[in-house]
Amino acid sequence: MRTYFGAASVAAAMLIGAIGAGAQTAPQPAVVYDAGGKFDKSFNEAAYNGIERFRKETGGTYLEFEVNNDAQREQAFRRMAQRGASPIIGIGFAQAPAIRKVAAEFPKVNFTIIDSVIDLPNVQSVVFKEHEGSFLVGALAVMSSKTGKVGFVGGMDVPLIRRFQCGYEQGAKHVDAKAEVIANMTGTTPAAWNDPTRGAELAKGQFARGVDVVFAAAGGTGLGVYQAAKDGKRLAIGVDSNQNHLHPGTMLTSMLKRVDTAVYAAARTAREGKWVPGTTSLGLAEGGIDWALDEHNARIISAQMKERLETIKADIIAGRIKVHDYMSNSACRS
């Protein structure tokens, strides 16, 4: 059994339609990963899976670079542009300053950035409505909690991660107004994305306060959270990629952020001469955000929980449930 609500094929069709329409030639694409490496089992790895899907389906090739520090970002994009790559796909909001500068220097090269918006004629921006998916998993967390206390571990303390936290809190309160959400951020530097030891420490601290379900939006740091949940016989929620398989039976679900499909769509539409600049925002309705149900968590998701969560999802898509976006006013209304 392997079921993803918002199946990959459907999401791909919707995202390709949203991201590409127009006509132009397309040289070899390139991907510049964010800190944490392409095999972080989360955000970067989703991007890697997307470009690998492009390679396998089209027979095309691509260039790639893994950023280890901020000083490498601008150099990486400039090098890719000099090599004639296009589109050059930057993974993560931290790539924005480098792309903004290099894209201005190479106006005939196309760039795609994931998780940020750059207003330049040769840049395509793809952002996600993370608050919608976080609302869903927050609701599921409280449905599954026996204590009424659920946790959140964020990576780097930035507005994007506050958006995750805020959506999660709203979903939890939607199910139970008395639910308590205990939240921690890992740090204030990019190192916060790749510190599983600290992630485990934060999770254990929350468990000691009564938390029995924890959601990590923290890149590689989340791996420590998930291990701590397994060791402590609690439940954890993955992020970005489907991480249910990491610890079957204690991974309640994963909030899917279809970075893989966005990267695939950018490369594929460029190859087909349909890449266009501009901003695309992807949420539940567009198939860019969802939750994961598969053979690894099916036993801990009851039919009633699934039905209720799908109803909440439909209500968000229809506008019957309004999910406040932290980034609209830098505040959370849960």
Descriptions of predicted regions:
Residues 1-4:
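Positively charged n-region of N-terminal signal peptides that target proteins for export
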Residues 23-334:
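A residue-level marker of the well-folded mature domains of exported/periplasmic proteins
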